[in-house]
Amino acid sequence: ICACLVGSEMCIRDRVMKVTWGDDYSICCCVSATQTGKEMQFFGARANLAKCLLYAINGGVDMKSKVQVGPAYKPVTSDVLEYDEVVAKFDKMMDWLADLYVNVLNLIHYMHDKYYYEAAEMALIDTDVKRTFATGIAGFSHVVDSLSAIKYAKVTVSERDPETGIAMAFKTEGDFPKYGNDDDRADDIAVWLLKSFLDKIKKRHTYRNSEPTTSILTITSNVVYGKFTGNMPDGRKAGTPLAPGANPSYGAEQNGLLASLNSLTKLPYEWALDGISNTQTMNPDALGPVSYTHLTLPTIA
């Protein structure tokens, strides 16, 4: 992407990518790599794990609609959230979500092939095509920070719905490590979350025996996901956008860009072969002086 035209650049960690994809690979969807002419991807969007965590706390009842959406597991009834209890309930709720997620995607891909098989595009790919089954995670850093807050600080339910009794808001007392600061206490939770979700996806049958993958990526959908997600134990307010991709939660990174990227690099790429996205905004002057007279625009013939 040309920085002088649109003001943004996409940097790819080629050294890591080549190990899996070889020299001749392409970015087929946002941050998803593929061996050119040899593979195709069944697109998978994202699962809102932030909302899944709230479902785990509230026994499958949606905080925004007050409707029973997930399975009616026993909710957390104590006012102080206990880490082991919340993680156990969250793990069980992720099982339900992964099963629903993969089943819906299988249906979509089957019906798409049935009614709109992309023959023209497939003609450009090898006969024995390798198929990957993409999935994704939204709300990644908010889940990590919420679990970290429950583990290392004191999180209490500060408001309950008078009709359903579900938790509506949380109060956090004390400090806690946050993802994006090169702190292993938070980053270890991030690694656990990624592996746990991928393992659950891999247990399900995927359409045409495609290889299950996952990503930590949102482009603008984090805004919509956030609109329908309630208050989080990490302090994020209901209705506000989720942090994009594998970015730290808004305002959580306190140790600078390198610390944020160090947290990112602890996430094993082989567990997120559909891609890991980290979006940074910075003042151009932070990169050093730029001589605009030396910028050249591309020529399109």
Regions found by a protein language model. Name each.
Residues 20-104, 168-177:
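N-terminal leader/propeptide and maturation segments of large enzyme subunits in energy/redox metabolism
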Residues 17-22, 268-272:
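A general structural signal for short secondary-structure junctions and capping/turn motifs
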Residues 71-77, 109-124:
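Active-site-adjacent bridging/hinge elements
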Residues 129-295, 301:
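Ordered core of a single globular domain
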Residues 82-96, 124-135, 182:
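Non-transmembrane, amphipathic alpha-helical segments
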Residues 1-7, 294, 299-301:
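Single conserved hydrophobic/aromatic residue that forms the stacking wall/gate
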Residues 10-11:
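Active-site loops and adjacent core secondary-structure elements that bind or stabilize anionic groups
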Residues 61, 83-116, 144-155, 190-209:
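Structural signal for hydrophobic packing residues in well-ordered secondary-structure cores
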